[in-house]
Regions:
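Carbohydrate-active catalytic/glycan-binding domains of CAZyme proteins
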Residues: 1-106
Length: 106
């Protein structure tokens, strides 16, 4: 669910792992979202029943100051292969400064 009326949530990716559903997405504010403090960030939520969700945006990860993804992390895409799961995402400037991936530990 939205935290406030000015928040935008986009690019959801739903996956199931054992008895939990995970929803990965990007979110942003309505003001100064291209390069500022309201820029895109990646978050996730989990649920047992697809109705009640626990949102955990602050746990996923954050860019290091002055890194290629320090100001923006957007448009997550999830890939599972073997027993590993990876998230690919765009960095600053909607991916202009690069894109990356991280292993998800669920």
């Amino acid at each position: 669910p939205q935290r406030n009326k000015k928040e935008a949530i986009t690019r959801p990716y739903l996956m199931r792992r054992k008895d939990l559903y995970y929803l990965f997405y990007c979110f942003r504010g309505s003001d100064d979202f291209r390069d500022g403090t309201d820029s895109y960030k990646i978050g996730y939520a989990y649920s047992k029943n697809l109705t009640e969700w626990n949102r955990k945006d602050n746990i996923i990860f954050a860019g290091v100051k002055e890194n290629w993804d320090a100001n923006m992390m957007a448009y997550p895409s999830i890939l599972s292969t073997g027993n590993k799961t990876y998230m690919f995402y765009n960095g600053n400037g909607f991916g202009k400064s690069g894109f990356g991936f991280a292993e998800l530990i669920l």
